[in-house]
Amino acid sequence: MRKLFFALLLLASGMTAGAQRNIQLHYDFGRNIYSDEEANRHKVELTLEQLNPDKWGCWFYFVDIDLSSHFVESAYTQIFREFNLAEHSPFAFHVEYNGGLNRNTSFQQAALAGFAYNGHSADFTKTWAVQLMYKHFFKSYQYTHSFASAELSVFWALNFAHRKCTFSGITELWRDEKPNGHGCLAILAEPQFWYNFTNHFSIGSEWEFSNNFIHNTNPESTQTFFWNPTLAVKWNF
């Protein structure tokens, strides 16, 4: 599971000068749905997110931590910095790092650079961002190699029912490579729905649709696209 819920973004407005932090705990049903293909998929994930707006733009990071009954199985992070191109401009220069470790090896690291367009409605109940970036994957472990890519990311957040409900999410498209070196289109979409009991506590669900970040454990399966829903709680600090 990979999240960049910058879509919860107050970034679009510079609405607050303070840091925005949340912690999410997800129970993942993917292994129940694909018992053969995702036999090793972890059921519990902890996500930490923080957004720090400032007068130049913002910092953002998240860390996804997969947990089992015995180990911290993996940790994956994305960290980015945006620099506003002008005061009150919706356009920003964007630089980013992706990478992480698991119990046996590592995720292939990548660096990204490009531009972002950030927007919001007058009352900030609707926010969105579009990012178009050059992406470079590095040789990170055995059988990987460096290669050039590009990524398009779209984020959104919609608050309604007097801000009791939030529908937010991300869709990302990028060029990946198959083991034989042939290029392919990688797709990741992660819509989330939250019911906000208070300003701090929410219960909701995330639905992950992806042909990437999946380790198919059934060599005879032809399944390439997966739907992995979760049940989750979130605390906003």
Give the positions of each predicted feature:
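Repeated loop/turn-to-beta-strand initiation elements of outer-membrane beta-barrel proteins
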Residues: 21, 56-60, 86-93, 121-128, ...
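Short glycine/proline- and aromatic-enriched beta-strand/turn motifs that initiate or cap beta-hairpins
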Residues: 19-68
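Outer-membrane beta-barrel transmembrane domain signature
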Residues: 135-202, 208-216, 235-237
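Sec-dependent N-terminal signal peptides
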Residues: 3-13
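Transmembrane beta-barrel strands of outer-membrane/channel proteins
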Residues: 25-29, 61-65, 95-97, 130-136, ...
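Outer-membrane beta-barrel "beta-signal"
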Residues: 225-237
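Residue-level signature of outer-membrane beta-barrel architecture
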Residues: 52-54, 83-85, 117-121, 156-160, ...
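Outer-membrane pore/translocation modules
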Residues: 22-27, 36-42, 70-155, 218-228
